[in-house]
């Protein structure tokens, strides 16, 4: 999957769950629970290969990645506390 498709996937999952997201250029960032979720890939262009969806905590000084999930659904499940 490419990063642009990953953004569309994240937006669709947010729409299903009534969660918010913001478009920043071609990228998108979702807010779920206490996390911000965004697709991460290499290279960092719309046609770059997706590595996963990162979950980060706001207001951290080092902005380290808290967790990297394979799909937008799993990332949002983790962020909102939904268990399988």
Predicted segments — roles?
Residues 1-32:
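Negatively charged, low-complexity tracts enriched in Asp/Glu with abundant Ser/Thr
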Residues 1-4, 80-84:
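Short intrinsically disordered terminal tails
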Residues 6-8, 15, 46-47, 51-53, ...:
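Terminal low-complexity, poorly structured segments
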Residues 7, 20, 67, 73-76:
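Compositionally biased, low-complexity segments enriched in small residues
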Residues 29, 56-74:
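A short, exposed loop/beta-hairpin motif centered on an aromatic-Gly-Thr core
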Residues 33-62:
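Short aromatic-glycine-(Arg/Gly/Cys) micro-motifs in beta-strand/loop hairpins
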């Amino acid at each position: 999957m490419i990063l642009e498709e990953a953004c569309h996937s994240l937006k669709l999952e947010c729409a299903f769950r009534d969660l918010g997201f913001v478009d920043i250029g071609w990228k998108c960032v979702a807010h779920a629970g206490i996390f911000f979720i965004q697709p991460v890939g290499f290279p960092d262009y719309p046609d770059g290969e997706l590595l996963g969806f990162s979950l980060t905590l706001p207001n951290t000084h080092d902005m380290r990645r808290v967790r990297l999930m394979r799909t937008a659904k799993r990332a949002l499940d983790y962020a909102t506390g939904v268990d399988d």
